[in-house]
């Protein structure tokens, strides 16, 4: 992956381009793993950003086998709603750490994906459809709220 500075610049450019192309539409930012974490870091640095929410597909809370919540310290600075889609077997986000973290963030919603790892592998379940449906439901609620 890129450095955080490069990732932040890329995210800012993507948001600016989307706002320019579709100024009338509500804008949500999403990322898988590092992309989601960099998006939330960027939004913590720019709380005035006009996105309606951030969607995390497997937030990388810590390195494999190194349980910690340090990577999430910036989340309390994020001023927009956040959706965390997390597997219970995610090797980069121990469930016993990610669940209380999300509970502590008043703007966070956590969707538990039983048996899924960081790549959202969970046997024969159709996880992609679950991710899409959960995202759609959350986004529609946020749009209706205004």
List PLM regions with ranges.
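Short beta-strand/loop motif that positions the catalytic acidic residue
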Residues: 78-79, 84-86, 90
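Catalytic histidine neighborhood in serine/cysteine hydrolases
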Residues: 104-119
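A conserved short beta-strand
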Residues: 49-61
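Short beta-strand immediately N-terminal to the catalytic nucleophile in serine-hydrolase-like folds
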Residues: 28-31, 57
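Serine-hydrolase catalytic machinery in alpha/beta-hydrolase-like enzymes
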Residues: 1-28, 41
